[in-house]
Amino acid sequence: MLKIADTTFHSRLFTGTGKFANANLMTQAIAASGSQLVTMAMKRIDLQSGNDAILAPLQKLGVKLLPNTSGAKTAEEALFAARLAREALATNWIKLEIHPDVKYLLPDPIETLKGAEMLVKDGFVVLPYCSADPVLCKRLEEVGCAAVMPLGAPIGSNQGLLTRDFLQIIIEQAQVPVVIDAGIGAPSHALEALELGADAVLVNTAIAVARNPVKMAQAFRIAIEAGELSYQAGRASPKQHAVASSPLTDFLRVL
C-alpha cells in the first residue's frame, strides 16, 4: 500500500481525465485501471453546472479527486486555482502544475518551488509536477510537499523514462513518495518505473488515446502490479559477462 499525507492507496496507478473521446469511455477506463486517485484540470470543469460532464461521473466512481493547476503560468495563478478547487470540491489536495512553455510543457522550476511554499503555508497537500532534478525535488520535499512528481519525458510524448538516471537519484534520496508523471507511453514504461523504485506513476495520454482505452487501462494495471512485485522480489543485477546457471564445478570434481 502507498500512503501520501493522510490517505492510503492500494493502487499505485494514478490517472488523468484529458483526451478521452467521451465521459463514458473515461469512467470505464479509470474503473478498469483500478486507479484510486484521478487528476483533473480546474480550467476544464464547469463549476456553474450541477452536473459537469467530467466531475459528476468521477464522483460516482468514488475515486479521490486531485485537481491540478494546469494553465497557471505563475505561483500566484496556481494559488488562485488551488483556492478555487478547494472551495468547489472541498479538498485541500492539489497537483501543482506551472508550465508557461506551451510547446514542450516543461515545468518552471522557480515558480514551482515558489508556488509549493505558498500552497503548503495555505494548508494544501501539495503534489508538484516538476523536472527530474534531484536538487529541486529535495527542496520541494523540504518546503513540505507531500510527494514529488518528476517527469519521465515531456507531457504526452509517450517516450518513457528519458530521465531514468536522474529519477534513480531522486528515488534514492526522497523521504516522500515519488510519483513519475508525464511521458509514460506504454505499460512497459510503468513497469520500469516501479522496478526502479518509484512509488507510483500517473498516466493519461497513453490510456486515453489508445485504440481501446479500457484494455490499455487493464494492461497498465497489470504492469504496475508486476513492477511492484519485481521491485519487492529484488531483480538480479545485470552483468557484462556470462554466468552459467548450472556450473560444471561439482560435476567435473566427481569425474
UniProtKB/Swiss-Prot annotation:
Q: What is its EC number?
A: 2.8.1.10
A Gene Ontology cellular component where this protein is annotated is: cytoplasm
Q: Where in the cell is it found?
A: Cytoplasm
Organism of this sequence: Photorhabdus laumondii subsp. laumondii (strain DSM 15139 / CIP 105565 / TT01) (Photorhabdus luminescens subsp. laumondii)
Full protein name? Thiazole synthase
Q: Which domain of life is it from?
A: Bacteria
Instruction: Kindly identify the residues recorded as the active site.
Output: K95
Catalytic activity from the UniProt record: [ThiS sulfur-carrier protein]-C-terminal-Gly-aminoethanethioate + 2-iminoacetate + 1-deoxy-D-xylulose 5-phosphate = [ThiS sulfur-carrier protein]-C-terminal Gly-Gly + 2-[(2R,5Z)-2-carboxy-4-methylthiazol-5(2H)-ylidene]ethyl phosphate + 2 H2O + H(+)
Mind listing the GO molecular function terms for this protein? thiazole synthase activity
Q: What is its main location?
A: cytoplasm
Assembly with partners or alone: Homotetramer. Forms heterodimers with either ThiH or ThiS.
Q: What InterPro entries does this protein map onto?
A: Aldolase_TIM, Thiazole_synthase_ThiG, ThiG
